[in-house]
Amino acid sequence: METKEKVQIDWKVVFKLGLILFVISAVAACALALTNYVTAGTIEEMNVQTNTVARQEVLPKAADFEAVPAKDVEKIASEIGMEKPEELLEVYIGKSNGEVVGYTVKTGPTSGYAGEVQVLTGISADGVITGITIIKSNETPGLGAKASGVWNDQFTGKSAKEELVVVKGTTKEGSNEIQAITGSTITSKAVTSGVNMSIQVYQNLSK
């Protein structure tokens, strides 16, 4: 009758392999942490530059932008009766040679056809919309994504003294109407809703 040979475990080898794996994992973790540390500042700087460019696009006359403190943004959201205060993301005061020339307001997420839509709106100190841009959108390409470019341009020059209304078909000249994107009324209303929030913020700041 054959006897089974006992298997001897060399604990020194096991410990050595475990130590090697630990060292490899530690080195990889340190390398990842170092990479994140090195790139974090660059990424943050790029985000700041991107947002500054976007503000200048919607409020061209501004040379400098001053952020309204978060606590004041929360107060504004409360004063204008926002059901979801968190949708008022940021408010900036645009200045040129020390004088206030207008405001930029970022709102979102308003509900579009396929998800959230964030809108940045520029409004001059005398109450005229100077431009809008869509900062973030999950809309379906070719449908909701049409809410850009030429369509955005119809907001420019509209009065910020009253809220805008989305209509199907041709708009009346000099009115507060916004022509809906064909086949994408939901997205049109989502973007316009964001702009209307910005109008309310402007009216609060200009009292």
From Swiss-Prot:
The modification FMN phosphoryl threonine is found at T185. The chain crosses the membrane at residues 18-38. It comes from the Bacteria. GO terms for biological process: electron transport chain. It is a single-pass membrane protein. Keywords: Cell membrane, Electron transport, Flavoprotein, FMN, Membrane, NAD, Phosphoprotein, Translocase, Transmembrane, Transmembrane helix, Transport. It is found in: Cell membrane. One of its GO terms (molecular function) is FMN binding. The complex is composed of six subunits: RnfA, RnfB, RnfC, RnfD, RnfE and RnfG. Part of a membrane-bound complex that couples electron transfer with translocation of ions across the membrane. Couples electron transfer from reduced ferredoxin to NAD(+) with electrogenic movement of Na(+) out of the cell. Involved in caffeate respiration. HAMAP family: RsxG_RnfG. This is Na(+)-translocating ferredoxin:NAD(+) oxidoreductase complex subunit G. The lineage of its organism: Bacteria, Bacillati, Bacillota, Clostridia, Eubacteriales. The gene is rnfG.
